[in-house]
Amino acid sequence: MELLFSNLAHGFGVALSLDNLLFALLGALIGTAIGVLPGIGPVATISLLLPITFGQPATTAIIMLAGIYYGAQYGGSTTAILLNLPGEVSSVVTTLEGYKMARNGRAGAALTIAACGSFFAGTVATLVVAASGPLLTQVALSFGPADYFSLMLLGLIISAVLAQGSILKSIAMVVLGVALGLVGTDVQTGQQRFTFGVPELSDGLGFVSIAMGIFGIGEIILNLERPEARSVLSGKVGSLWLTREEFRRSIPSVLRGTLVGSVLGILPGGGASLSAFGSYMMERKISKYRHEFGSGAIEGVAGPEAANNAAAQTSFIPLLTLGIPANAVMALMVGALIIQGIQPGPRMVEAQPDLFWGLICSMWVGNLMLLVINLPMIGMWVKLLQVPYKFLYPAILVFCAIGVYSLNNSVFDVYQTLFFGILGYIFSKLRMEAAPLLIGFVLGPMMEEHLRRAMLLSRGDVAVFIERPISATLLAVAAVTLGAMLLPGLRAGKDKALAE
C-alpha cells in the first residue's frame, strides 16, 4: 500500500506539471465537444489528431488522447438528454430516460447526475487501474511467447464476438485487419509481402492512414447522408440540484454502474457501450421503480453514465499491462505509443514510470476538470450544436489531408487515407463494424512475432501451445467462446440483446 501511494504521488507530480495540465484540459474540452456533436465520436477524433502528437512528449500526447476518450463520455450525455440524440454510442441508453426527464422539466437534474455519477465512477475506476495495473504486470512478466500468442488470439475472438452484427462478418473483419498488418517487408526474411510492386508499401500500410480513413473520413461521408435537423429542447434546463429523493435513488445505481463498467471495460470489444447497456438492463430489472422506466427514471441515467465512464478508464488496464487493446480507441493508443517509440506492455511500469503513473493520475485530474467545466458550460455546448455540419465537415477533411501529409510529406499517404475512407463508408453500408479490423491490424504483427518466437524456442513443436498451462487455458476459452457464439440460439440471443 505504501508503494502504491508513493507511485501515485509520483504520478500526480507528472500529471500536475503545467504542460500536462494544459493538454489534459485540451483533451477534456475536445472530448466533450465531439461527444456533444452527434456523428463524430472519439475514435474518429483521436485518429484525426494523431499527427499533431508526434512533436509532443509521449506522456503529454497520451494524456491528451485519453482526455478526449473519457471526455466524450461526458459530452455524449448532453445531447442524449437535451436532444434525444446520442452524441456518443455509449450514450444511446441515456436517451431512453434522460430525454424523458428533460421533457418532464428535470433536464438539469439529469445533467447533474450524469456528470456527478461519471466523476465518481471515474475516480473509482482510476483507483482500480492504479491498484491492479502493477499486479497484472507482474503476472504478465511470467508469460512466454506461446502464452502471449494465445492471449492475443483470445482478444481477437472476443472483439469479434462482442461486435455488433453478424459474427461471421466480425470474424472476416478481424482476418482482414490481420492481413493488412502483414503488408510490407518481413523483418525476418527481408521478403516483401502483399506490396504488389508498389514501393511505398514496402514499409507497410500507415496506421494513421487506416485509422483516419476508416473512422474519420468514412464516418464523415456516412453522416452526409443523414438529415441535419436538430431541435434542442425548448424551454429552460431547470435547476441543476437534485431533490433528496432523486439523490437517494441515484446512489445505488451509480455504485452498481461503477462496478459493471469497471469489470466490462477490461473485456476486448467491450468498453463503454457494452457497459452502459449492461448497467441499464440491470437497473431496469432490479429497480424498485421499474414502472417509471420509459417515462424518466433517474436510475436509467445514473447507472449507465457511471458505467460508461468507469469502462473508459478500466479499458486502459489490458493496454498498460499486456499491451493488448480492449477496443478501437485503445488500438489507436497502441498506435500512438508505437509511433512514439514505446512498446506497450508489462515493462512500461519500469521503463516508462512517468507515462504509466502520470497517465493514471491524469485520469482523475481530467475527470475533475470535466465535472467543473461541464455543468457551467452547458449553454456553450448547446450553442455548439447549432454549428451547421456543411461548414464543420469540410474543415475536418482539410485538417485530415494536412495532418496525414505532414507525417511523411507524402501524397501517397493522402491517397491511402482517402482509399480507406471510401472503404470505411462501404463497411458501414454493409453493416460491418470496423473496430475488429483495427484491433486485428494492431495485434496481427505482434501475434506473428510471438508465434515465431514460440516456434523457435520449441524447435518447431506446435505442441508448445497446449503444453503450457496458461496458453492451453486461453486457447480453450477462445475455442469455447467462438463455438458458443456460432450456435444459432446463442447468436440470436446476442443479436437480440444488442438490439435492445
Go through the PLM ranges and name each one.
Residues 59-63, 100-117, 288-301, 328-331, ...:
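Membrane-interface alpha-helices at helix entry/exit sites of multi-pass transporters
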